[in-house]
């Protein structure tokens, strides 16, 4: 009986061992198969990346990839500007505004590249002058520099009239007011100056009388005078460029060529015919009212007025306006805003 019991126990032990070995061998074989499959996939990927003759599989391009990679987008997915500009359905849509803005920006860039690619002979411009309401208009040239090339471009042709200019062009009233708002966010009115240029003296005098009806105005009116017009030599142009950029060591000869003025005959000065009007004010309220007056004149006479705005290096404040300046800025910088609201 004892021998039979020992035999049975030995058999059971062998069966358990065999079952364990079968399980471990199965797991080992499965792991080996998985590793071999992974290695084959990795080798195939490496071969596909290294081989130059492999062609990528063409997949349909969705709108997300078209937005990120526009060079891989088909023609029907791309932004169709003509569709949004001409279709009546998009008359009041933002897509119409976006397409118009993109088209206008491309047009301005093309116009500027055409303008800058050609050399400039002078900075003179022709403009009809209204000496009175009954006399005829005359053409006045600003300088005596003659054109050397027929393909040269007039520098002031880039500035269009207020009626035909786009809303974001350099001479538009919208751009002029946006620059005033931008400067007023950083500086006060004592550092900002409005400049008006025109050949029509009657128009400048009318604008001066209109501005004098606004309080706290400081106006400087005069006609521009130019000295004798001469051309610079290439050595002078290179010297002044090197002087400012610091590409070469600043020697005495370089400073002399850069700083020494070109002597001309002072008796050859002459009046250009352009009247300039400089406007300053101690407060933002006064200067903003003056800007609206200038814009109204520019809209009524678009071809005869040029507006400009400048930021001064130091405040221009008269003694009569110091108390006005202090009382106006007291509520902004010193006291609490709650006092104004109450």
UniProtKB/Swiss-Prot annotation:
**GO terms under biological process:** regulation of DNA-templated transcription
Bias class Basic residues marks the residues at 14-25
InterPro entries listed in its UniProt record:
Herpes_IE2_3 (IPR005028)
- Listed Pfam families: Herpes_IE2_3
Region Disordered: what ranges? 1-33
Parts forming coiled coils:
none
Q: Belongs to which family? A: Belongs to the herpesviridae U84 family.
Protein name from the UniProt record: Protein U84
Tell me the organism's taxonomic lineage.
Viruses, Duplodnaviria, Heunggongvirae, Peploviricota, Herviviricetes
